[in-house]
């Protein structure tokens, strides 16, 4: 995608990797329940072990203290990827700059929703409302926020 925007240097690719990784991670956390139902688990095994949260608990959609700590850790790591990728937008022009900012901000907003739900992504999939999307787009176009 960077090539379509005219960016071909290694630094732009590095920044894009951070942004794309963050967006993919948000999607994983947002879709834990639906992915489990499809036989997919994207939580790293080492992190499950570190926080003593089992796949059996995951299969039941159990949100306990260990799960919240695990997801707090994953959310913090995801935010770091977003933060490291944010300078990419400043390297781009026009619609490309807006697109990257919009996607990054959208991902960060979904991550906010995951956190506000106490990391309980099993009862309700965190998504932006139509109003939330409109507000996000307006803020991005007007340059309000990060």
Model-derived features: positions:
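Catalytic cores of Mg2+-dependent Asp-rich isoprenoid enzymes
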Residues: 2-22, 34-146
